Amino acid sequence: MLTSSGYIQHHLTNAQMCTVDGSIAFNYACADAGFWTWHIDSLLFSVGLGVLFLFVFYKVGQKATTGVPGKLQCAVEMLMEFVSNAVKDSFHGRSPVIAPLALTIFVWILLMNTMDLIPVDFIPEAAKQILGVPYLKVVPTTDMNITFGLSLSVFALIVFYSIKIKGITGFVKELTLQPFNHWAFIPVNFILETIALIAKPISLSLRLFGNLYAGELIFILIALMPWWSQAALSVPWAIFHILVIVLQAFIFMMLTIVYLSMAHEDH
């Protein structure tokens, strides 16, 4: 019989794929695979939601009209205007990439976070009964690999635009001559600025992961309670969690815009 701790552990375990002795293995066989383990559920759901985002926006763009728009077109236009205003208010450089990037980050993370509102046993149990999959996590942002992948992409853009706008020399000066503008403090400046630079992707990823992981864990704990108390607890928490879902996507987007704006500042 599955215990409470076993139930929690089961729902927090990813569907894994790895290579063992030259052949592909899954789940239990990947216990000792270490770094070279693929979380295939996180990959499938994140890519699938990304494709859904592209498909919906593409279809809306194709059917866009200057007349009376439909409900979906109104929603997409409001979302695009919201992101566009956020970029105009926070980004002070010139780049046609930032607004589409911010829109992609916000909508993609929002879709991945929204998966947390699906009942915790619904999709995993269906996958187990139909496909025989023993483990399945449906919320990609509760997987640190996904959140770190997103934040490392942002980090790469920060470094790229810093070098592009300021040049190699300007980027090195930024790391070595701030905050103390004296050659004697170059080692101290380099350590402080390097830590500050590396802290950006780490804080981005851990903030998103921590909030969604905690939310998922609370849903799992509620599912362990007697049936008569589940509705009384799950509905209020789901309503509150909607705020968390939207807020975390917004924070990730805004910090990305701010960091890239800082990278475009030419001192």
From Swiss-Prot:
F-type ATPases have 2 components, CF(1) - the catalytic core - and CF(0) - the membrane proton channel. CF(1) has five subunits: alpha(3), beta(3), gamma(1), delta(1), epsilon(1). CF(0) has three main subunits: a(1), b(2) and c(9-12). The alpha and beta chains form an alternating ring which encloses part of the gamma chain. CF(1) is attached to CF(0) by a central stalk formed by the gamma and epsilon chains, while a peripheral stalk is formed by the delta and b chains. Key component of the proton channel; it plays a direct role in the translocation of protons across the membrane. The gene is atpB. It is found in: Cell inner membrane. Belongs to the ATPase A chain family. Pfam families: ATP-synt_A (PF00119). One of its GO terms (molecular function) is proton-transporting ATP synthase activity, rotational mechanism. It comes from Psychromonas ingrahamii (strain DSM 17664 / CCUG 51855 / 37). One of its GO terms (biological process) is proton motive force-driven plasma membrane ATP synthesis. GO terms for cellular component: plasma membrane; proton-transporting ATP synthase complex. It is a multi-pass membrane protein. Keywords: ATP synthesis, Cell inner membrane, Cell membrane, CF(0), Hydrogen ion transport, Ion transport, Membrane, Transmembrane, Transmembrane helix, Transport. It comes from the Bacteria. InterPro entries: ATP_syn_F0_a_bact/chloroplast, ATP_synth_F0_asu, ATP_synth_F0_asu_AS, F0_ATP_A_sf. HAMAP family: ATP_synth_a_bact. This is ATP synthase subunit a.
